[in-house]
Amino acid sequence: MCIRDRILVVNTASYCGFTKQYDELQELWDLYKEKGLIVLGVPSNSFNQEKKINSEIKNFCEVNFNINFPLTTITEVKGENAHEIFKWAKENHGKSAVPKWNFHKILINKEGKVEDTYASFTKPMSKKIINRLENIL
């Protein structure tokens, strides 16, 4: 599979200690969208910390974090009911691709392969993520 852009898939939640990472996700999007990075927020209640209505999530993100990167609808990210992208990531990259908590990050390169995964505590603007992005953009 070949895709034009690189994608950072992040499972998000409104009521999590990591929710403040929305700020850095927006910063990352602003810095790299013209270079071919898509930041894709995937709201999920898999860890029971997300609102129940998609429009409320969108409003929360816009009002509190002024985000304008794409958000999906509420999606399961683990287990049997996980969305296909998370099942695919697990099959192609192993257990490290399975979110263990909110704000888990999966970086997909332009060849459509999992480039790397990052745990919740890895901030979007961390050197670890920035260095990897700089190498693949």
Regions found by a protein language model. Give the residues of each.
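Short, internal strand/loop/helix patches
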Residues: S55-N102
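Conserved small/polar residues in nucleotide/adenosyl-binding loops
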Residues: M1-D5
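Conserved helix-turn-beta segment immediately C-terminal to the redox Cys motif
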Residues: R6, Y15, T19-P43, E62-F65
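Short histidine/acidic/glycine/proline-rich micro-motifs that form metal-
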Residues: S14-C16, P43-Q49, T75-K78, S120
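Short, surface-exposed acidic-centric catalytic microdomains
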Residues: G36-I38, Q49-N59
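Thiol-/selenol-based redox modules, centered on thioredoxin-like
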Residues: K87, E91-L137
